[in-house]
From Swiss-Prot:
Transmembrane segments: none annotated. It comes from the Bacteria. This is Peptidase E. NCBIfam families: PRK05282.1 (NF003642). Its main location: cytoplasm. CDD domains: GAT1_Peptidase_E. SUPFAM superfamilies: Class I glutamine amidotransferase-like. Keywords: Cytoplasm, Dipeptidase, Hydrolase, Plasmid, Protease, Serine protease. Its EC number is 3.4.13.21. One of its GO terms (biological process) is proteolysis.
């Protein structure tokens, strides 16, 4: 069974309403047959799960979908089992993966999506779709059991990617931090996914959506820039992906 994923860099662009830039793509991706959506708000920290879920619920209602937030149901495992789509919101990646491990939902979600159920994630929700969360930008505010993610794609994502250099700032750039990761993880690609872009994965095809380019990093290689019309299918070339 093939996987279907829509992995967003971010939820909101400057000057826009929440998830505005992604709404039509989300609707196109889910289609008209999806009715039961499971939403996971575990990345929320400064906001309550309830407040966060209602914010996301409004967006999905506006485009014709209802969903159940996982913290409100009696059995989170049953919710995932019966879901027709899984949506994982952004926030703090370490808190998100901690809660997914703690609730023992990682295997449930992985199995569900591996059997064809659509998965949508933004920011932290895209991070956890990767083999690990090691390319997150977030502060490790909590120690998870493991950095292992859902392993739904065979590459890493760095959401909110920017190659901007802050004047008079001597800290590491994003690219330098990713280079550190690659030294210790030389066999995996990292996709620098700028805000306002997303990756749509269906079967053995992957497509960049948005009006910006992405950057691809691999140990020992020059970073490569890819445009929305470029073929990225090679990123999915892993025997165990499907």
């Amino acid at each position: 069974m093939s996987k279907r994923l829509l992995l967003l860099s971010n939820s909101t662009n400057i000057g826009e309403e929440y998830l505005f830039y992604a709404r039509q793509e989300i609707k196109n991706f889910l289609g008209s047959s999806v009715k039961k959506i499971a939403f996971i708000p575990f990345a929320a920290v400064t906001s309550t799960y309830q407040h966060y879920s209602e914010k996301v619920r409004k967006v999905f209602q506006d485009i014709g979908y209802e969903f159940d937030a996982i913290h409100l149901v009696e059995s989170s495992h049953e919710l995932i089992k019966n879901a027709e789509a899984v949506v994982v919101g952004g926030g703090n990646t370490f808190h998100l993966i901690h809660c997914l491990h703690e609730t023992k939902l990682l295997d449930d979600i992985r199995n569900k999506v591996s059997n064809g159920t659509p998965y949508i994630g933004w920011s932290a929700g895209s991070n956890v779709a990767c083999p690990t969360i090691k390319t997150s930008n977030d502060m490790p505010i909590i120690e998870p059991i493991s950095f292992q993610g859902l392993n739904l794609v065979p590459f890493q994502i760095n959401p909110h990617y920017t190659n901007a250099v802050i004047p008079n700032h001597n800290g590491e750039t994003r690219e330098q931090r990713l280079e550190d990761f690659l030294v210790l993880n030389p066999d995996i690609y990292v996709v620098g996914l700028p805000e306002g872009t997303m990756l749509k994965i269906e079967d053995s095809s992957i497509r960049l959506i948005g009006n910006k380019t992405i950057y691809l990093f691999k140990f020992g290689e020059e970073k490569q820039e890819y445009y929305p019309h470029d073929n990225l299918d090679f990123l999915l070339e892993r025997a165990s992906f499907t």
